[in-house]
From Swiss-Prot:
Homodimer. The active site is at residue 38. NCBIfam families: bioD. This is ATP-dependent dethiobiotin synthetase BioD 1. ATP binds at residues 13-18, 55, 116-119, 176-177, 205-207. HAMAP family: BioD. Gene3D superfamilies: P-loop containing nucleotide triphosphate hydrolases (3.40.50.300). The gene is bioD1. The lineage of its organism: Bacteria, Pseudomonadati, Pseudomonadota, Gammaproteobacteria, Enterobacterales. It catalyses: (7R,8S)-7,8-diammoniononanoate + CO2 + ATP = (4R,5S)-dethiobiotin + ADP + phosphate + 3 H(+). Belongs to the dethiobiotin synthetase family. It is an enzyme of class 6 (ligase). GO terms for cellular component: cytosol. Catalyzes a mechanistically unusual reaction, the ATP-dependent insertion of CO2 between the N7 and N8 nitrogen atoms of 7,8-diaminopelargonic acid (DAPA, also called 7,8-diammoniononanoate) to form a ureido ring. Substrate binds at residue 42.
Length: 228
């Protein structure tokens, strides 16, 4: 049976992709056939191969099961803004059925599929649909990425509560050091451990400006997911 997870974050720019790559690496090391899925991405660049998103490319690189880019990232937008805004501007609506079909295709091939969201938990995909709505429909277990910085405790508690209210299991969380640790870093982590109702899968240290290129799977322990 395919293991499937959804990665969300406490905010945008908290390192969801860094954590997702680490998860894919760690699952591959456990012997799984892994694939990462970034169904909606904005902030993409035109290349000789067409419009490409750096986060989706990172997931593609870190998947053990080779996939064409279109399978990893069905909706790609150039402007780095909320998906519902840019999709409306371009007249290209985001269809939840397309997201689900893409997920089914990957699930039929891999036994460990990781879907990465965009922005935070309630990121709008249209005037009537949020990413949270789609995740709830798919009944995906959730992994929360916390970018460790001032304000992250409140954001983590709010997101964990929203996941719980959606009736979805929060199966783990990852502390991602998105800046050099400050004087209160240890206290932030201790508080997060206490208030997030899920096991800590690991802490990814501050790695500088290109963390998605690093071997980050070593920082995670997926045994709580194996037991779930």
């Amino acid at each position: 049976m395919t293991k499937r997870y959804f990665v969300t974050g406490t905010d945008t720019e908290v390192g969801k992709t860094v954590a997702s790559c680490a998860l894919l690496q760690a699952a591959t090391q456990l012997g799984y056939q892994t694939v990462g899925y970034k169904p909606v991405a904005s902030g993409s660049e035109m290349t000789t191969d067409g419009l490409r998103n750096s986060d989706a490319l990172a997931l593609q690189r870190n998947s053990s099961l080779p996939q064409p880019y279109s399978a990893i990232n069905p909706y790609t937008f150039a402007e780095p803004t909320s998906p519902h805004i840019v999709s409306a501007d371009e007249g290209r609506a985001i269809d939840a059925a397309v997201l689900s079909r893409g997920l089914r295709t990957l699930e039929a091939q891999a036994d460990w599929v990781l879907t990465e969201g965009a922005g935070g938990w309630f990121t709008p995909l249209s005037a009537t649909l949020t990413f949270a709505d789609w995740v709830q429909t798919e009944q995906l277990p959730v992994i929360l990425v916390v970018g460790v910085k001032l304000g992250c405790i409140n954001h983590a508690m709010l997101t964990a509560l929203a996941v719980e209210q959606a009736g979805l299991p929060l199966v783990g969380w990852i502390a991602n050091d998105i800046q050099p640790p400050g004087a209160r870093h240890g206290e932030y982590l201790a508080t997060l451990r206490r208030v997030i109702p899920a096991p800590l899968l690991g802490e990814i240290p501050w790695l500088g400006v290109s963390p998605s290129q690093a071997a980050t799977g070593q920082y995670l322990d997926l045994s709580p997911l194996e037991r779930a």
